[in-house]
Amino acid sequence: MSGRAGLRVGLGLLAGGQVVLGLWIVLLPELFWKWPWVSHLPPYNEHLLQDFGGASLALAVVLCAAVATMERRLVLTALVACLVSSVTHLLFHARHLEPLSAASAAGFMALLGAAVLLPAVLVWLAADGTALREPGSAGTGGRPG
């Protein structure tokens, strides 16, 4: 798999994850709240959940645009936005693991760690523009000659 294809697949995975998460929260906020990794946190607040779901869907739009265009600045912007969201999410949950069993906390941190690692690796892959070039477009950084 080429760097460009790998980058596109990774962006697609991130976008798909945000779509699923966002739709779940927007359409079924109480069901999302009942998830064991969420329900032990501060009291249920539908407004905040709807905002979080909407923000997840908004991030999905930017990630989908990056997948569609593979334009360097948009790809990097989308990935950095995803990374900021993932890092802050991980840091919050890392401070609130007490109610979880050791196995559940370890699984949760592994999942959140992967949500940080994937966009970080993709930023590294996209940073110099090589992976964004169309096959046969040497030196254009993915932009038309």
Regions found by a protein language model. Give the residues of each.
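Cytosolic juxtamembrane helix and N-cap/initiation of the first transmembrane helix
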Residues: 1-18
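Hydrophobic transmembrane helix segments
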Residues: 16-48, 53
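Core segments of alpha-helical transmembrane spans in multipass integral membrane proteins
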Residues: 44-67, 84
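Individual transmembrane alpha-helices with interfacial aromatic-anchor signatures
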Residues: 52-54, 103-117
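Loop-to-transmembrane helix junctions at the membrane interface
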Residues: 68-82
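Hydrophobic alpha-helical membrane segments
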Residues: 78-93, 113-117
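Membrane-helix boundary connector in multi-pass membrane proteins
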Residues: 91-107
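Membrane-water interface at the C-terminal end of transmembrane alpha helices
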Residues: 114-136
